[in-house]
């Protein structure tokens, strides 16, 4: 709660700090509450901050605030829109404004592109394809994620109200391998969804429960090689998932295809 980002050296000695931007584009009435970070090879800092919906806060390596990038597009429900047309002033003031939503988490890949995810979605926008819970941002903040798959990149395609869970997947964190396969973590049902560089779902696994490989409250995901690491916030535990033989063949096929070994890739598939 010190409203700053600290930069430390390898021995944890203080180097510098990044503090609340003093700029007309940053609401000075808001507290600066950074919660997620990504750093590029030039030392620039990209920050997700609580209550900031203009996109990622960008700092140069010297600590200077240089603006926002990657603001999400405004989405709204047509029912809410029509209701606002006929509501009284008092009723409109009580309703949520149509504003861009916040990001939950970010991950910078090996090329310097930023994968960003948000749980601020609705059933209707997920169903009609207007919501993008996962994005891939270039340095201009434009979403360049390829969506050529059969289904929208939203986790579960169908959802019900069984087992004490309801509603769609909420992608709370994301990580990406060097072969452009990325994996999103659903905090509702504890599932992991993997997609290739074209947006095709490769596999999904996981769930909530007390058995090995299941979660109580999954909150973060990362990887080491092709091993996936998932943090359980409630259990205070870290689960490590190593690829099965099936998973190894998937990664092998993708790696071979990217290396131009098309026949070998076909055999692996």
Give the location of each predicted region.
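Eukaryotic scaffold repeat domains enriched in small/polar residues
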Residues: 1-269
